Amino acid sequence: MRPAFRSTLFYIALLLTAASAPAAAQRVVPQRVAAHRWSEVTRRFEAFARAAGVIGGSAVLVRRGAIAARHHYGLADRTGARKVNDRTIYHWASVTKTLTAVAILQLRDRGLLALDDRVTRWVPELREIHDPEGAAEGAADSITIRMLLSHSSGLQNPTWPWSSGEAWEPFEPTAWSQLVAMMPYQRLHFRPGSRYGYSNPGYIYLARVIEKITGDPWAVYIQKNLWTPLDMHRSYVGATPYHLSADRSHGYRVAGDSVTDLGADFDPGITMPNSGWNAPVDDMARYIGFLTGSPADPASRARHGGVLRRGTLREMWSPVVETDAALPEFAAAGLGFFSLESAGRRIIGHTGDQAGYRSYLYVDPASGNGIILAFNTTNDRGAGEREMAALAAEAIAALRP
């Protein structure tokens, strides 16, 4: 998560609370967005895009699992002059972690694991990680499923901390064996369960648990148990399927007047369970509908309940550990989701930043409202922060009935 955007994310979460507060004992689901309000959102969106040098992006308001309003900007492919549109596929980076978390809770609800189980039951290789406190029983044996989900395990943040930045290097380790070979050269950074510390590899280990229990590769399990029943048929990980390639956005890196095209596809390797998700905004709207249980038709609501119980989702959003100064926009980490309490309401969400793509997912579960912001550009100089905050304010205000 890039420091330049942290204050912006606080505005998003805070304003979402104000924008969707319901009357007592009644869910408020706005039916339409005032034309003048959405016009101001699009103006702010374009002001940020110009200030930050964004090549392409989308802002989307979601109600009851469907897109209520959207605004697309710029190009999905600069060289080919291909515009962003309804079908454009973005990379959602760390928002992927929420899928892995949902999958783990599915297995818990089926009685196949417990949140306080030791992870080394399925991933014994973790015992090779150095314990600087020299406990008689390695500290890795005290890491639980719950700790991995809530980023409180003591494991490091980056999956591969030794990159030299050479163009020929793989983007990330590509095989489980490579990750295992690294373990004796890593250490725990704090006592497991004692505090918060964001960890990308923790979600790779959760995926390993899923694979050991089910026998399915992580991506196959997600396809069968989340995307298919939720009608998210254009979501995928890894290389873009041929039939979707015309819709895939490129990623871009901007530094001053210099723009680098990072291409459409890249290999996230072993990190797919923490950052591999690619999808159009329509699929993300369906995902918000699942999280909130708010689709208009009863058949969809029933199908969503078969994916994961409402009570389990609420459990996932409950705070487990307070975040630290590195994550000021959220007060707490839950089980795969971050949360902020404001005016008695809980806002949940996750963000992503990888390979030129930035993504923002924020949801008010009580009202069923959500906001999605997606960009295909990283600005190495953090330009446009003030404009981004103004955009967030207007976008969230548009949720009001």
Cite the ranges covered by each PLM segment:
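Bacterial N-terminal signal peptides that target proteins for export
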Residues: 1-10
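Sec/Tat signal peptide C-region and signal peptidase I cleavage site
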Residues: 21-24
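Short, charged, amphipathic alpha-helices and their helix-cap/turn boundaries
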Residues: 37-41, 121, 165-191, 216-235, ...
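Active-site SXXK
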Residues: 39-48, 59, 65, 89-116, ...
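Active-site helix/loop module of the DD-peptidase/beta-lactamase fold
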Residues: 57, 86, 91-95, 107-156, ...
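Short glycine/proline-rich turn/loop motifs
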Residues: 80-84, 181-190, 263-271
